[in-house]
Amino acid sequence: MKNYSMKVFVSVAVLGTLAFILMMLQFPLLPSAPFLKLDFSDIPALIGGLLFGPLAVILVELIKNVLLYIVSGSPVGVPVGELANFISGLFYVLPIYYLFHWLRSTKGMVLSTAVGTVLMTGAMAVFNYFVLLPFYIKLGGLPANTDVAWLITYAIVPFNLLKGVIVSAVFLLLYSRLKKWIAKNQTMKERRKFEKRQQEISH
């Protein structure tokens, strides 16, 4: 963090706040699972990563979930849902950041978002199966006879795949318009990474 300037910290805080606002605008995606809601709060984290690096991704995801917990609380008393969203965001955004670092093209960005979607879906299936759903069942948030495997297969996995596709499509549209602006406003460290990788690709 010592390499982050005050300007970068302020920018990350703004992106985190924007992510929180977008998260508050969530809406159900699958009629069969109305408790699973889509939002576009990972897009500011993606932009933050491209501008300032992977630490910005973590901070934006953290800020939005801390703000959400402060404002909305949790029906079970502990921020389990916020933890799930934090993990989901990291497994989606960080793979995109790191893979795009090597591919550096429009096709590379499309592939990166596809990989991020698959990794996020897998991570959330595992987290829900072993942690989140058993926790909710234990606290009475779900019936004791809930078929966790069925819920994972027919709700959690389809939801996260659809979420990844929709969020990726919106981000790719934004990225096509913001690409030059992002390149102009990147930190020097991220710009050097980009230039170094461009030289490697050209050779």
From Swiss-Prot:
Coiled coil: none
Keyword flag Transmembrane: yes
Keywords: Cell membrane, Membrane, Transmembrane, Transmembrane helix, Transport, Virulence
Molecular function per GO: riboflavin transmembrane transporter activity
Transmembrane segments: 8-28, 43-63, 83-103, 117-137, 154-174
Gene Ontology, cellular component aspect: plasma membrane
Subcellular compartments: Cell membrane
Phenotypic effect of disruption: Mutant lacking this gene is completely avirulent in mice but has no detectable growth defect in nutrient-rich media. Deletion mutant shows only a slight defect in growth in media containing riboflavin, but does not replicate in chemically defined media with FMN or FAD.
Mode of membrane association: Multi-pass membrane protein
InterPro entries on file: ECF_trnsprt_substrate-spec, RibU
Record-level GO BP terms: riboflavin transport
Keyword Transmembrane helix: yes
UniProt record similarity statement: Belongs to the prokaryotic riboflavin transporter (P-RFT) (TC 2.A.87) family.
Subunit details: Forms a stable energy-coupling factor (ECF) transporter complex composed of 2 membrane-embedded substrate-binding proteins (S component), 2 ATP-binding proteins (A component) and 2 transmembrane proteins (T component).
UniProt function note: Substrate-binding (S) component of an energy-coupling factor (ECF) ABC-transporter complex. Mediates uptake of riboflavin. Can also transport roseoflavin (RoF), and probably 8-demethyl-8-aminoriboflavin (AF), toxic riboflavin analogs. In addition, during intracellular growth, binds and imports FMN and FAD directly from the cytosol of host cells. Essential for virulence and intracellular growth.
Protein's name in the database: Riboflavin transporter RibU
Organism name: Listeria monocytogenes serovar 1/2a (strain ATCC BAA-679 / EGD-e)
Gene that produces this protein: ribU
